Amino acid sequence: MKFGQSENPQHIDFRLPTDDPHTAEILKQNDTGKPMNVYVGCDKWNKNDLKNFYPRGTKDELSYYSRQFNSIELNATFYSMPSRQQVITWRDKAPNGFRFFPKVTQSISHMRRLNDVQMLTDEYCDNISNFEDKLGMVFLQLHDNFKYKNFDRLVSFIENFPKAIPLAVELRNTEWFNNTAVSNEVYELFEKHQVTNIVVDTAGRRDLLHMRLTTPKAFIRYVGANNPQSDRERLDDWINRFKIWVELGLRDIYFLFTKISNWNRPFFPPISLKE
């Protein structure tokens, strides 16, 4: 079974938990005079993954996709180091206002597991920077067996990551969530370096729904259960939570859908989150 999935999602309590108290403190520090930025997208633009999404005869999928949504979780950068030219090609196909959220290459996160990765990280960031103003936020997704014993590697990676490039991190191992002292150490690190703590809403790992923001930005990865009723209710729940966070000071929302097996336009309209 793939990470975060459940054999019986119909038995999962999908209600959002209450916020960590520190989330309100983080949001209240934000400048409420800033305009709202809401970015909604998927984890792929391939027509084989977004069934029923593209009109018949669509040839340039990214060009069409980027005019329906304003962001994308870019997984292609996870599987191989992106070249400068590839980044420029992607960038130039998307309109102004679109944002790419590229995942850190697996050679850094999964193969070397953040050990001795400075040269690779520099190469990655040099190439990714060619997204220019269409770069949303780079995100580091660590393997679910990356544990607290490797915390020093995470510290080093964050301390040496270019400050000009916004960074988010998704932790997966249960140790990061079931030990308060460990969790607090991570959150302090993230807050110190302005690293966004990704919240994952997935059926099989409700502990990833920690509701603990470390920057005044909400980066949500929503894993669909592909049940129209429960997914609709979950999305409504998120919209209500965002309303609370906006009142507290939230001005940046990144909401990325993943594992949506059959696209239904009326079901996940991007405008629903913007409203």
Regions found by a protein language model. Give the residues of each.
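Residues lining hydrophobic/aromatic ligand-binding pockets adjacent to catalytic sites
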Residues: 1-275
